[in-house]
From Swiss-Prot:
This is Phosphoglycolate phosphatase. Mg(2+) binds at residues 19, 21, 182. HAMAP family: GPH_hydrolase_bact. NCBIfam families: HAD-SF-IA-v1, HAD-SF-IA-v3, HAD-SF-IIIA, PGP_bact, PRK13222.1-2, PRK13223.1. Keywords: Carbohydrate metabolism, Hydrolase, Magnesium, Metal-binding. Its EC number is 3.1.3.18. It catalyses: 2-phosphoglycolate + H2O = glycolate + phosphate. The active site is at 19 (nucleophile). One of its GO terms (cellular component) is cytosol. Pfam families: HAD_2. One of its GO terms (molecular function) is phosphoglycolate phosphatase activity. Transmembrane segments: none annotated.
Length: 272
């Protein structure tokens, strides 16, 4: 039985919201290269790929502080040093995303959802300045009606603000929505928003298995969500998905756009 058949018996969600890093794309190689360049410029030894893999998922500021601390706990990192290091990291990461790749099954799943008329949104803790260019490079940006970066709203995941915002914009309820991610922050945000969450085993969760966070469903491949997508009897095959060239309009939610719609969110209580 597919993931959708388990979570939405007899129907489909009206809205599917996705995390980005560790869910749709493997960006750790480029992030690690930027972290190591930052550390070298500060006269420190590089951290390496596997260390960075355990540190990502909570935004650039936290990643930089973890790199300076050499671990998950970064409370003792000097704020001035962290600010200097963040600028170095942002400059380094902006230069190249050549090592970033889309995970297998992602494009098939996005095409299938679009063919079914399911609205899609992207909610990431990655700074918004990187999100649009990266999505364009990966050729998946046109699938998403709403795109929210980590510094778009006053809060980032695990706060549910972005999920609540997108559901309000889409005019759907939590019961009609699904969030797909790979980390504790994703699961916590979904639960706080009252939304079912699918956890992916291949992503970044600080070295912890995603099932330890108790998402609604755990899968190894996004295509496990799709009911019979490779079964010709359904009339929808992977060949159909790959041939689809339709494009949807996309709303990239920037900081300026946020100021225009903040009044519409007044009924939500922002958590400190």
């Amino acid at each position: 039985m597919s993931g959708f058949e388990q979570l939405f018996p007899g129907t489909l969600p009206r809205l599917v919201m996705f995390d980005l890093d560790g869910t749709l794309i493997d960006s750790v190689p480029d992030l690690a290269a930027a972290v190591d360049r930052m550390l070298l410029e500060l006269g420190r030894p590089p951290a390496g790929l596997e260390a960075v893999r355990h540190w990502v998922g909570n935004g650039a500021q936290v990643l930089v502080r973890r790199a300076l601390a050499g671990g998950i706990d970064h409370a003792d990192v000097d704020d001035a040093l962290a600010e200097q290091a963040l600028a170095l990291f942002m400059d380094a990461y902006a230069e190249s995303h050549e090592l970033t790749v889309v995970y297998p099954g992602v494009r098939d799943t996005l095409r299938w959802l679009r063919k079914q008329g399911v609205e899609m949104a992207l909610i990431t803790n990655k700074p918004e300045r990187f999100v649009g260019p990266l999505l364009d490079q990966m050729k998946i940006g046109n699938f998403f009606r709403w795109i929210i970066g980590g510094d778009t709203l006053p809060q980032k995941k695990p706060d549910p603000a972005a999920l609540l915002f997108v559901m309000q914009m889409a005019g759907v309820t939590p019961q009609q929505s699904l969030f797909v991610g790979d980390s504790r922050s994703d699961v916590q945000a979904a639960k706080a928003a009252g939304v079912q969450c699918v956890g992916l085993t291949y992503g970044y969760n600080h070295g912890r298995p995603i099932d330890a966070e108790s998402p609604s469903l755990v899968i190894d491949d996004l295509r496990a969500l799709l009911p019979g997508c490779a079964d010709p009897a359904t009339g929808i095959t992977l060949a159909d998905l790959q041939a689809s060239q339709d494009r949807e309009s996309t709303v990239a939610v920037t900081g300026k756009f946020w100021m225009k719609v903040i009044k519409a969110l007044a009924r939500w209580r922002w958590r400190a």
